[in-house]
């Protein structure tokens, strides 16, 4: 009989494969931990307070904080008051990056947040639920001698969340508030070398614009971007892993098509998982180095979503097809109760992502976190997603427990077998349990990775919650996905070896009782694998 490679491989060879995969997994972690720098970096320039007394503030003149033609600036708002300069004539100008540096397409994205330094004054304090109005213009250029070109401009409102750590008394005047960072904009590509931000805080008492926001002392324009060195390591991993998965996927499907039977459900799902892994591996990001593809962040989220959906569905089907409860499954329709919610959840994630990053393709200043309702919905989504992920993990653990329990029940039939048959099935069950444990470990690590990335993307805090994810964790989990898919397609591919009764001539052969108990009657040489026969889930031919 022709079974899967995992059923015919000796324990010694299986251990060798396991050690090789483990070494590659350790290598994936070391690549991130020792070679790659931290995934993200940031620059935090303090915006220069430029004076622009022109009547038409909307004209095309850009105010530079430094350079050959720096703007006329002031040191503080006290100086502005002494010189009778109105607040509407003050422009916060910030150049990214700092002088003598350049931005690069290797940075992949740029997230910009604002940090306000606000001093407490008894006659000018921050009111409750105050909003700050920002008149923002962003320009770019690729040469220091070029004229600035407008990238985007908008008038945005952001909620001001500040806490004064001391009592509001006269003695504490001048103490600074502790304020949350204000999300400003996000760019899906960094295709230019220099960026200039001109930000006004227009005051309009009639419209209540920028009234009750305290005494602003300074404004920090914090720019967060992916490290170029990490991008190179990440691209190199993708470039190396893509052909590896494609080759094993072609080899796997070729072995299946050479058989006289049609593929069973588990084999189809494993191939689909390999295809989704290939889709996420293909390093199309190389093109973003030469082209201004602002949609790459959204495209990356879609690829990850497809892989997550396929991976979660595979684990459910993998456990169900090995339940050993004599229930005929082998059809995707049997799992609609489990796979349906995964598909629904994936669609919800896609809609949420389109509402955030989809809109940012047209308006980079848009953020769902800028309003109370949007922030509450987004936070609720993250909490619900985390809860659903944990519930899914618990349900998966329960299914694994059922599989192990049913296997233990089947093991009671082993003493009645011949020695050769008993050793064969004991090895088969051991290898299956080993693969189930590895699956459970991968599921746990994937859930942790999902929750961690969701929390970090949702907040981008500079304080309590670090904006940086561990490089070793990124590369290690990514390598784990690829090694897991590679191992599945290799171990569950049909074997060229044949296992029959002639292989155990020293025993009396398998009795009819054994065949009835374990449902392993051989119909033809290319029949379902022994795991499928043991589970009682043969393909309908």
UniProtKB/Swiss-Prot annotation:
Stretches in topological domain Lumenal: 29-232, 290-303, 353-379, 453-471
GO cellular component, one term: cytoplasmic vesicle membrane
Keywords: Cytoplasmic vesicle, Developmental protein, Golgi apparatus, Membrane, Signal, Transmembrane, Transmembrane helix, Wnt signaling pathway
Signal peptide interval: 1-28
Top-rank taxon: Eukaryota
MF annotations from Gene Ontology: Wnt-protein binding
UniProt xrefs under InterPro entries: WLS-like_TM, WLS_GOLD, Wntless
Subcellular location: Golgi apparatus membrane; Cytoplasmic vesicle membrane
Entry's transmembrane regions: 233-253, 269-289, 304-324, 332-352, 380-400, 432-452, 472-492
Gene Ontology biological process: intracellular protein transport; positive regulation of Wnt protein secretion; positive regulation of Wnt signaling pathway; Wnt protein secretion; Wnt signaling pathway
Membrane topology term: Multi-pass membrane protein
Pfam family, one: WLS-like_TM
UniProt topological domain (Cytoplasmic) ranges: 254-268, 325-331, 401-431, 493-541
Subcellular location, principal: Golgi
Similarity section: Belongs to the wntless family.
Purpose: Required for a subset of Wnt-dependent developmental processes, in particular, eye and pronephros development. Regulates the secretion of wnt4, which is required for eye development.
Protein name from the UniProt record: Protein wntless homolog A
Lineage: Eukaryota, Metazoa, Chordata, Craniata, Vertebrata
Name of the encoding gene: wls-a
């Amino acid at each position: 009989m022709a079974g899967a490679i995992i059923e015919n491989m000796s324990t010694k060879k299986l251990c060798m494969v396991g050690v090789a995969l483990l070494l590659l997994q350790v290598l994936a972690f070391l690549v991130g931990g020792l070679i790659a720098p931290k995934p993200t970096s940031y620059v935090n320039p303090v915006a220069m307070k430029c004076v622009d007394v022109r009547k038409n503030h909307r004209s095309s003149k850009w105010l530079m904080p430094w350079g050959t033609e720096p703007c006329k600036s002031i040191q503080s708002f006290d100086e502005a008051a002494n010189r009778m300069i109105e607040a509407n004539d003050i422009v916060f100008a910030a150049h990214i990056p700092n002088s003598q540096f350049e931005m690069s397409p290797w940075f992949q994205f740029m997230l910009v947040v604002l940090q306000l330094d606000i001093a407490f004054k008894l006659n000018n304090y921050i009111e409750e639920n105050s909003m700050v109005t920002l008149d923002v213009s962003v320009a770019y250029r690729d040469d220091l001698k070029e004229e600035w070109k407008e990238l985007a401009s908008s008038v945005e409102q952001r909620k001001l969340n500040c806490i004064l750590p001391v009592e509001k008394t006269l003695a504490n005047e001048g103490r600074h508030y502790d304020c949350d960072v204000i999300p400003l904009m996000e760019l899906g590509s960094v295709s230019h070398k220099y960026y200039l931000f001109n930000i006004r805080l227009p005051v309009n008492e009639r419209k209540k614009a920028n009234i009750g926001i305290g005494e602003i002392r300074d404004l920090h324009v914090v720019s967060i971007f992916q490290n170029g060195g990490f991008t190179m390591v990440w691209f190199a991993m993708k470039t190396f892993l893509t052909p590896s998965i494609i080759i094993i996927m072609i080899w796997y499907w070729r072995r299946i098509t050479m058989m006289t039977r049609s593929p069973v459900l588990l084999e189809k799902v494993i191939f689909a998982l390999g295809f989704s892994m290939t889709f996420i591996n293909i390093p199309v990001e190389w093109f973003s180095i030469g082209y201004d593809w602002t949609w790459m962040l959204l495209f990356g989220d879609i690829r990850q979503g497809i892989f997550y959906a396929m991976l979660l569905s595979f684990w459910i089907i993998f456990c169900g097809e090995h339940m050993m409860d004599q229930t005929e499954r082998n059809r995707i329709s049997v799992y609609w109760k489990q796979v349906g919610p995964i598909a629904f959840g994936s669609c919800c994630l896609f809609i949420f992502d389109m509402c955030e990053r989809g809109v940012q393709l047209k308006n980079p200043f848009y953020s769902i976190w800028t309003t109370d309702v949007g922030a509450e919905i987004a936070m609720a989504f993250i909490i619900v997603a985390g809860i659903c992920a944990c519930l899914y993990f618990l349900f998966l653990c329960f299914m694994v427990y059922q599989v192990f329990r049913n296997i233990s029940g089947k093991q009671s039939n082993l003493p009645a077998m011949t020695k050769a048959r008993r050793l064969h099935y004991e090895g088969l069950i051991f290898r299956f349990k080993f693969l189930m444990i590895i699956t459970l470990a991968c599921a746990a690590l994937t859930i942790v990775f999902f929750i961690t990335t969701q929390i970090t993307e949702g907040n981008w805090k500079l304080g309590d919650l670090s904006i940086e994810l561990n490089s070793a964790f990124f590369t290690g989990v990514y390598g784990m996905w690829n090694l897991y898919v590679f191992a599945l397609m290799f171990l569950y591919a049909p074997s060229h070896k044949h296992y029959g009764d002639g292989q155990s001539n020293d025993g009396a052969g398998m009795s009819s009782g054994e065949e009835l108990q374990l449902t392993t009657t051989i119909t033809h040489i290319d029949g379902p694998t022994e795991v499928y026969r043991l589970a009682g889930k043969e393909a309908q031919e």
